[in-house]
Amino acid sequence: MGYVSGILLVLIGLLAGVGLGVLLRQYWLEKRNRQLQEQARNILTDARKEAETIKKEAILQAKDSLFQMKAEFERETKESRKEFQNLEKRILQKEENLDKKSEALDKREGVIGKREKVLQQQEKELEENTRELHMLIEEQRKKLESLSGISAQQAKEMLARAIENEARHDAALMVKKIETEARETADRKAKNIISLAIQRYAGDYVAEKTVSVVNLPNEEMKGRIIGREGRNIRAIEASTGVDLIIDDTPEAVILSGFNPVRREVARVSLERLISDGRIHPARIEEIVEKVNIEIENAIKESGEQAAFDVGVHGIHPELIKLLGKLKYRTSYAQNVLQHSREVAFLCGIMAAELGINEKQAKRAGLLHDIGKAIDHEMEGPHATLGADLTRRYGEAPPIIHAIAAHHEDVPAEDVLAILVQAADALSGARPGARKELLETYVKRLEDLERIAGSFPGINKAYAIQAGRELRIIVESGQVNDADVVLLSRDIAKKIEGELTYPGQIKVTVIRETRAVEYAK
């Protein structure tokens, strides 16, 4: 019984505890709910206040913007009204001016109408006077024909011939005067530019010969070079493409060939074979192959070095190789690569003085003789070949034209072509730059004197200054002072058309009048 009572008490205590807990939880929940409702009301109140504030600010901003827009609109309206008023004033002024001009035009029309009537009357009178004048002229012409015994047509022809002769004389005098003035000015400026170019460029130069002789240590070496039954000499000629001539010349053999590069390969190969001592077909082919590679590399290096020295970049590799080949080519004993380098420097200096593209001038000068690298392989003038080459490898049109025109195969169309012509002549004409064979030199002198003697009125002609000047003495009775200018020009043009020569030739025509009287 006591045990049951204890359990009941425990259960009652538990139930009482649970009930008390439920009541306490209910109380806490209600309190928490009231707190949350209070927070919600506070948040709602704050939000309403903030919304009211934002609304007021927006209204104020809208009013302010409206006020500014209204003020801007009023200002623009005033400006537009003012512009319209000014425009209206200008229109009124123009209308007044137009009215005045209209009145002036009406007055002018009246005056012009009166003048037109007067002119018509004068025109009628002029026609009548012209008819009368023609009649008088016809009468006078008939009288003159009857008195002079010649017709009007014959008189016209005589007058025309007289006027033509007088015009020729005046034209010759005028040409002489203009040429004298132009030459004085041009010579002065050209001399300044050329002298400056020569002063600024002072390149060293040694005249080269087309050497094709290989020295031997002794006469026995000739037999070794020939080989058994001539097999060595045949191997050398087959490998190099050059003729090997062995004659009575002591301790020397001669290499003959049109291609200067092949001749250089043969010379170097033969010298190495002689130095090595082993001369047989297999060794010859081996040495020639090695020398070919070395010469090709040397050619490329020479072309690159020339372009670098001049300061020209971006040249096509094939043009560089052809440029290097010019090292083994000579013209009148002048090395063509050195000549091209010299022309490039002179072109650049003169271009700088004239204010044109200096780099383009140097490029044209360096490449102007590029055609000489292949003129022994292809037919045609080297200037034309060079122009075709540079066109093929993408050079600029002014460069191509300057190359084509540097020997006047085509007319020069720009200053660059003239510069290349001048620099080419300057490089080739300076003393010691070029040499020529005695036979060629003598024939050129004879041709100069022959050309001068082919013109009428020539008394004597002398080629002097090593063929760089042609001095001509004319008959004073057949050639007058005015004709001397035209004669010198005609002779110079004929020389240009018929002869080939380095540099330029000065043509001097001398006319002398002597009056002799004896005192008795």
From Swiss-Prot:
Domain HD: 336-429
EC primary class: hydrolase
Cellular location(s): Cell membrane
PROSITE patterns per UniProt: HD, KH_TYPE_1
Ranges for domain KH: 210-270
Membrane listed as a keyword: yes
Gene3D superfamilies, alphabetized: Hypothetical protein af1432, K Homology domain, type 1
InterPro entries in UniProt: HD/PDEase_dom (IPR003607), HD_domain (IPR006674), HDIG_dom (IPR006675), KH_dom (IPR004087), KH_dom_type_1 (IPR004088), KH_dom_type_1_sf (IPR036612), Ribonuclease_Y (IPR017705), RNase_Y_N (IPR022711)
CDD domains: HDc, KH-I_RNaseY
Gene Ontology CC annotation, any one: plasma membrane
Key words, A-Z: Cell membrane, Endonuclease, Hydrolase, Membrane, Nuclease, RNA-binding, Transmembrane, Transmembrane helix
E.C. numbers: 3.1.-.-
NCBIfam families: HDIG, RNase_Y
Protein name: Ribonuclease Y
